[in-house]
Amino acid sequence: MSTFGELANEVVNNSYHKDLLRLSWGVLSDDMEGTGLMLMANLFNMSPESRLKFGRLGHLSTGRDNSKLRGHSITLMYALKNFVDALDDVDRLKCVVEKFAVNHINRQISAEEFGKIVGPFRAVLRIRMGDYFDEEIVAAWAALIAVVQAAL
């Protein structure tokens, strides 16, 4: 199993995946709140047990009407922006990932549990990327998610 540092280096040194991450981020970030809410809704639908980790957000089915869920969705998207912005500097990427990981460690979210976001992320990418969707884009995001998992 690769270490946190090794996985971060793999992401930073893979130009093709970095291009895919940046390209897809350009699409995903066009509606950051909507994309974040879609990602969270997909997570709750595809992994209903994950709802238990989000009790502090209140009633999750209210979507945009739930300010705590909206806030979490927006914060999540800005974390992804930080990751994408750090793709050329492994030390910076590690710093922003570690900060993000601390929030999840404090909520007792394991690496395995966090990895459940890949399926919902694939679904968001399929919708948002439309005809430009490709499994290589999913692989690029999965590699970045693996860095977060290694930090947990």
Swiss-Prot record:
The residues that the entry says bind heme b are H104
Question: Which keywords does this Swiss-Prot/TrEMBL entry list?
Answer: Heme, Iron, Metal-binding, Oxygen transport, Transport
**GO MF assignments:** heme binding; metal ion binding; oxygen binding; oxygen carrier activity
Recorded hits in PROSITE patterns, A to Z, give: GLOBIN (PS01033)
Keyword flag Nucleotide-binding: no
Q: Which domain of life is it from?
A: Eukaryota
Q: Where is the Globin domain?
A: 12-152
Family according to the record: Belongs to the globin family.
Name of the protein described by the UniProt record: Globin, minor
